Amino acid sequence: MDYIFVRFLAMGVAGVAWATFICQGISCVLAIVVVFRHLGALQSEKKAVWFSMPVFLQICTVAIPSILQQSFVSVGNIIIQSLINGFGASVIAGYAAAIKLNNLVITSFTTLANGISNYTSQNLGAGKYERIHDGFKAGIKMVWTLSVPLVLLYVIAGRWLVYLFMDSSSGPAMDTGILILRILAPFYFVVSVKLVTDGVLRGSSMMGAFMIATFTDLILRVSIAAVLSSKLGSIGIWSAWPVGWALGTMLSLFFYFRAKKNHFLLKSREMVQIEEEEKLEV
């Protein structure tokens, strides 16, 4: 749609906006139709209520932190963009090209993490805590399997990928884009672990832990970028990403393994209680 509105209808920036609005609107309507069709197929003895305050509040405990997280991420990106703007058009163009390629990878990791989040919720509700850890390990294997070819591609063939967004005459911009990819790509193994772990935390409704890890990553990235950019130039901004990812990952893993330990303790207590009840019955 973007291509059609811009290339053939010559609508420029407005065409991109209208294409986005139309596509997302159609997706929204289709999603609602599919949901209601599946809900109508469900059989239940109880009549479904149109609105439940307890359910609404439970949804809010997960939704509001997620909304805040996305809002603060956007604010952080604006601050980083303002730092980048101070280095001129070439750096801005190189960053714009590299960040598109970076977002392609992060979006792939996020999609897998969302699947892990749903998997975690289902097994948590069923009381199958050991399967949560199995899902976590499977998620790590999947994102690392995806990371290997992407890291090699971005590090070795980053120049040709950046060519997709600019021509060879944009020398400084090209060099900036390649440098960003070579700095960020090796740390995809790190940020992928964070995103999978965050998916487990969200699926476990541990939104406090999720927000702490996410905001720590964001605050560190922005702060370090601001400090290093004054000393190292634009390289300082790109170097802030891996630092934020690494510390955010450590926090996410800390909260995950603490939760895992508590769940297994809970399970062991339930097993002991069942065994004691069986002995009394005998």
Residue ranges, per PLM feature:
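Short hydrophobic/small-residue motifs within alpha-helical transmembrane segments
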Residues: 188-189, 216
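Helix-terminus/linker motif at the lipid-water interface of multi-pass membrane proteins
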Residues: 4-13, 71-100, 104, 122, ...
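Small-residue-rich hydrophobic transmembrane alpha-helices
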Residues: 94-158, 191-213
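Transmembrane helical elements of multi-pass membrane transporters/channels
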Residues: 23-27, 31, 35, 53-115, ...
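Short alpha-helical transmembrane segments in multi-pass integral membrane proteins
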Residues: 8-64, 120-186, 228-282
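Alpha-helical transmembrane segments and their helix-entry boundary regions
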Residues: 16-17, 92, 207-211, 237-238
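Transmembrane alpha-helical segments of integral membrane proteins
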Residues: 220-228
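Interfacial helix-capping/hinge residues at the ends of transmembrane alpha-helices
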Residues: 2, 81, 114-118, 198, ...
